[in-house]
């Protein structure tokens, strides 16, 4: 990954969280009862290959937010960190794919890390846009995710995991820290089949 893409990912995922928190926290502390909610990712708990900068940025959000939560204990402001699993948003449709994620795009569709075309289970080559749409449609409804987050805030949960996939991956990482990756791969293959990929 080139330096521009590295900095872009960190600016979006991590530096924006710091800037937002630093800007709004003083105002929140003046109110009677408030909450600051930062979004990390399940990829701030587990790791996968070929996503180094994304993991680094999401782990950084986790560290920043959980440390801030400890500093703010006893104050009028609750600090929460959200760890979403697969949510049905347009993030994959609008994603900026660096050379770490896909090798490129041919006229027929995207090329995977091995340089081979990405195909669905029927053998049809898939465009980058179509891959993003399928990913979105297979995820949890965003309204349901929002309700889970609000419920977590009301219960004053410092860590809010959204989706059964996020909960399972977090548990597997804690119980099997050296081998959880095999479970993650199995789950990923299952989800890929459900969304129409080999």
What are these regions (language model features)?
Residues 41:
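Residue(s) in the substrate-gating loop at a strand-loop-helix junction
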Residues 46-53:
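Active-site loop immediately N-terminal to the catalytic Tyr-X3-Lys motif
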Residues 74-160, 164:
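SDR active-site lid
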Residues 188-195:
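Conserved small/polar residues in nucleotide/adenosyl-binding loops
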Residues 2-7:
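Substrate-binding pocket helix/loop in short-chain dehydrogenase/reductase
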Residues 21, 57:
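Active-site helix of classical SDR
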Residues 46, 67-77:
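Active-site-adjacent segment of SDR/Rossmann-fold oxidoreductases
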